[in-house]
C-alpha cells in the first residue's frame, strides 16, 4: 500500500491544476446538457465563427484550403467559440493506479486535442487525433440529427506482485463529442475510419435543391 500511496500522491501533485471529473454520460447527453447545444457545422465556415475563434486564441486556419479550419481544443477564456462543444472532446487520462482502490479515487488529467474540418460541394471531412485508439475502441453514430463520437481504451501498463499484494497500474483515455449535423448532411452515408491514431469522418452532402419561384398575381 505504501507504493500505492506514493504513486497516487505523485500523480495528483503533478496534475491537480488540470484535474477534472470523468463523466459517464453519453456524448449526446453531454452535448444536450450544454446550454449552447451541440456544435453546429455551419459555424465552422462563417466569418463570425472565424472571428470568435480568433478572439479565444484557440483556432489556427489550415494552410492551402479556404474551406478548411484547424482547431486546437483549448478553452482559455470560457467564452463560446465555433467548436465550443469540442471542449468535451478531450481525452481524459486517468491517474495511474494500483488495483480498484486507486481507480476509485483517481482524478483525470486533460491534454490538448486538435481537430480539422474541410468542406467541398460533395462532403464534409472531419479529422480528429485519437492517439492510442483503434477502430474497435471508437464508436460513431447519429442520434436525432447529432453526430456522436465516443472512444475509450484502458491499458495495463505495469503489474505489481510485491509483498503488499497483487495489483496493477493502468491508464485509460476517453474521448467524446456531439456535433449537430447541417441540413444537407446525408446521415445514412457517413463513414468513419481510424488510421495511425487519427479518426477520419466523412459526411456526404445532398445535392443543392433548386429553388422554385412562383409568381402570384396581385389583384
Swiss-Prot record:
InterPro entries: A-crystallin/Hsp20_dom, HSP20-like_chaperone, HSP21-like. The keyword Transit peptide applies. Belongs to the small heat shock protein (HSP20) family. It is found in: Mitochondrion. Keywords: Mitochondrion, Stress response, Transit peptide. May form oligomeric structures. Its main location: mitochondrion. One of its GO terms (biological process) is response to heat. Induction: By heat shock. It comes from Oryza sativa subsp. japonica (Rice). One of its GO terms (cellular component) is mitochondrion. Residues 104-219 form the sHSP domain. This is 23.6 kDa heat shock protein, mitochondrial.
Amino acid at each position: 500500500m505504501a507504493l500505492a500511496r506514493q504513486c497516487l500522491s505523485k500523480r495528483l501533485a503533478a496534475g491537480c491544476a488540470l484535474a477534472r471529473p470523468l463523466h459517464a454520460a453519453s456524448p449526446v447527453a453531454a452535448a444536450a446538457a450544454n446550454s449552447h447545444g451541440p456544435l453546429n457545422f455551419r459555424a465552422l465556415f462563417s466569418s463570425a465563427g472565424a472571428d470568435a475563434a480568433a478572439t479565444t486564441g484557440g483556432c489556427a486556419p489550415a494552410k492551402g484550403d479556404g474551406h478548411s479550419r484547424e482547431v486546437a481544443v483549448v478553452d482559455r477564456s470560457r467564452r463560446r467559440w465555433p467548436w465550443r462543444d469540442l471542449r468535451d472532446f478531450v481525452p481524459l487520462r486517468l491517474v495511474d493506479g494500483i488495483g480498484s482502490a486507486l481507480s476509485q479515487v483517481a482524478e483525470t488529467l486533460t491534454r490538448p486535442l486538435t481537430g480539422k474540418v474541410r468542406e467541398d460541394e460533395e462532403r464534409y471531412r472531419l479529422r480528429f487525433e485519437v492517439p492510442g485508439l483503434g477502430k474497435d475502441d471508437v464508436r460513431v453514430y447519429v442520434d436525432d440529427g447529432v453526430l456522436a463520437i465516443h472512444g475509450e481504451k484502458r491499458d495495463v501498463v505495469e503489474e505489481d506482485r510485491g509483498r503488499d499484494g497483487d495489483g496493477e497500474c493502468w491508464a485509460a483515455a476517453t474521448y467524446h463529442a456531439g456535433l449537430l449535423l447541417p441540413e444537407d448532411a446525408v446521415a445514412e452515408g457517413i463513414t468513419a475510419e481510424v488510421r495511425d491514431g487519427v479518426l477520419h469522418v466523412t459526411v456526404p452532402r445532398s445535392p443543392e435543391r433548386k429553388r422554385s419561384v412562383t409568381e402570384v398575381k396581385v389583384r
